[in-house]
Regions:
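C-terminal alpha-helical "lid/dimerization" subdomain adjacent to the S-adenosyl-L-methionine
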Residues: 154-206, 216
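Conserved alpha-helix/loop element of class I SAM-dependent methyltransferases that forms part
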Residues: 32-50, 66
């Protein structure tokens, strides 16, 4: 891993460690409660999947629990931030018994080949410096015909929505996030990382190059989020 990648991951980890207690609240308020429906769309894809599952960049298990509501298989929740994982463990849920938290790097997964029947990553691919390596790792740990589900921010294609959305990210969301968490810089980074993230068409090409086959590629909420479902 080069120094630039190390520095980037250290920065992201520090920001997530700092905002952990208000992370879910800002996500819900900042998305006008659309995040609930986005997670539901992901979780439904796991309904008939074979376990065990892996939820990457899991944060405090917000998506993990939604997946387990649909399919109570063994689920490993991996995140770079120990603070996120510890906070997730404080959530009272009968589903905790199916969940196994693990601190780790999504670009270097500590699992054997062909371990998981399905893998999810919500709003985490954007934060990984080496996306090709990450996708290759996802492919490696999935079983044959295993399911990969990615939920990630994207930019609306329509200029009528694109520019107001950019203004909202830079000023509205950063103000809200800064007010509630005390770390405005974390949400300025969020706005910047969304702008820099490749469009869905480019991510699709990367997934196919690694060896995945498209099951579903869908724009949600006027294009501010994209849902990718691909099969090994």
């Amino acid at each position: 891993m080069n120094r630039e990648s190390q520095d980037h991951k250290a920065f992201v980890k520090a920001k997530f460690d700092r905002i952990v207690r208000r992370y879910d609240l800002v996500n819900s308020l900042g998305s006008f409660y659309q995040d609930y429906f986005w997670r539901k769309r992901v979780a439904r894809l796991f309904k008939g999947a074979e376990g065990p599952f892996l939820d990457l960049c899991s944060g405090p298990f917000t998506l993990s629990f939604e997946i387990l509501k649909e399919n109570s298989s063994q689920l490993f929740a991996l995140d770079l931030s120990l603070e996120m994982l510890l906070y997730g463990k404080t959530k009272a849920s009968p589903l905790q018994k199916y969940l196994f938290p693990l601190r780790g790097d999504a670009e270097r997964l500590p699992f054997k080949d062909k371990t998981f029947g399905a893998l999810s990553i919500a709003f985490g691919l954007r934060n990984l410096p080496d996306r090709v390596r990450a996708l290759q790792e996802f492919y490696r740990v999935l079983k044959k015909e295993g399911l990969l589900v990615i939920l990630e921010f994207s930019m609306p294609k329509s200029p009528l929505l694109r520019y107001p959305y950019l203004l909202y990210l830079k000023y509205g969301l950063s103000f809200l996030g800064g007010l509630l968490t005390g770390d405005k810089e974390a949400y300025l980074y969020l706005a910047s990382s969304i702008q820099k993230f490749p469009p869905p068409e480019e991510i699709h090409r990367l997934l196919e190059k690694v060896g995945f086959k498209k099951v579903l590629l869908k724009s949600l909420t006027f294009g501010v989020v994209t849902l990718y479902a691909y099969q090994k």
